[in-house]
Amino acid sequence: MLNNAMSVVILAAGKGTRMYSDLPKVLHTLAGKAMVQHVIDAANELGAAHVHLVYGHGGDLLKQALKDDNLNWVLQAEQLGTGHAMQQAAPFFADDEDILMLYGDVPLISVETLQRLRDAKPQGGIGLLTVKLDDPTGYGRITRENGKVTGIVEHKDATDEQRQIQEINTGILISNGADMKRWLAKLTNNNAQGEYYITDIIALAYQEGREIVAVHPQRLSEVEGVNNRLQLSRLERVYQSEQAEKLLLAGVMLRDPARFDLRGTLTHGRDVEIDTNVIIEGNVTLGHRVKIGTGCVIKNSVIGDDCEISPYTVVEDVNLAAACTIGPFARLRPGAELLEGAHVGNFVEMKKARLGKGSKAGHLTYLGDAEIGDNVNIGAGTITCNYDGANKFKTIIGDDVFVGSDTQLVAPVTVGKGATIAAGTTVTRNVGENALAISRVPQTQKEGWRRPVKKK
């Protein structure tokens, strides 16, 4: 179906008292992203011409968190109901566009469901998203005559007979801009709450002889709202279960789908294996045959084919070439890069450092602001001393260098190709190619020396 241009209104003015938080409710995160950001992303994916965000409490925090989104900010100074919120946005509606109404605390609404709702909207009428519940207590009921939707009655205003209706309003609807503005202008607050209900436009449309078409979401979780942290945690598990299922069906081996969290986007090759309690954040790419051990956190990184990341390793903003091995208990910070076949072992930290092909840093090492060549051995306890208290400096190590244990390289410094650094050395000057650098104090030995003893 050919759709009109469309704008989206997202209601996000609520305080979220039951969250017991200083943070606006819609900024609490699901899968590592603010609830309202999920909704904004869905609106943008639908091709919304404009996204109007109706806000109230915590406006400064919202604007700071969402500063990168192209939003039209609409203030609702007093929270007088959903209809009142839409009235604040109405001056921005074009007559010839469709207006889709969404909620910042309903984060799992899918683009597919919204597109079906958009396609189903009748000319001059309203598309309405509804669901049927075994226990509809507290929700607005859908009233019908001869199968046609005639209105929505809120639970507090419903008769005993109406409260037996199981079909309820989700709050998500779409209509033409000109019609929406006209109906909004007719709303009153003559109800138990003393608020302006957006749901009253359904009856107004019916009275004008307009058609109202109800559409159901694919999953109930799509229209579940969040009012407290318990509800948020439940939706988190729903979301994670869905993501895990998609990955399993796509060929990724998750050892326990219930103990896997995806907080971003995962692109993967074939025969990828992910153990328990792994967290994927941001945009992550895993090549073919990658193995990730338990307890790892991988964020905004590209992991090449045949890499193996051992348990409890943290990788952030990193590029790993093929066949690298990492961990356990390693930390690769932003700017770390490993070339093919490189190895980083336990309790090694890297930042803004490149480790060349076949090079290895086995244990207890810090490599920062460093460029390390191919086939280099970094001994245990090696530290690149890159910071003088004010500025950072670089360490350059050529190919085929052997760095002994407990070595400090005080940057800026360069170690030439094939050089050897003796264990316990503090390198403060450049080392030439194929040279031996040693700076430790000569060993002395005192025969028959006795350790001090405690006085009685």
From Swiss-Prot:
The record's Pfam families line, in alphabetical order, gives: Hexapep, NTP_transf_3
List the catalytic residues: H363
Q: Primary place of residence?
A: cytoplasm
Q: Where does acetyl-CoA bind?
A: A380, N386, Y387, S405, A423, R440
Residue span of region Pyrophosphorylase: 1-229
Q: What is a GO molecular function of this protein?
A: magnesium ion binding
Q: Which residues bind Mg(2+)?
A: D105, N227
Query: What are the record's GO terms for cellular component?
Result: cytoplasm; membrane
Report the subcellular localization. Cytoplasm
Q: Which reaction does it catalyse?
A: alpha-D-glucosamine 1-phosphate + acetyl-CoA = N-acetyl-alpha-D-glucosamine 1-phosphate + CoA + H(+); N-acetyl-alpha-D-glucosamine 1-phosphate + UTP + H(+) = UDP-N-acetyl-alpha-D-glucosamine + diphosphate
Q: What is its EC number?
A: 2.7.7.23, 2.3.1.157
For region Linker, the annotated ranges are 230-250
What is the protein named? Bifunctional protein GlmU
Per the UniProt entry, what species is this protein from, by scientific name? Shigella boydii serotype 4 (strain Sb227)
The gene that this protein is the product of is: glmU
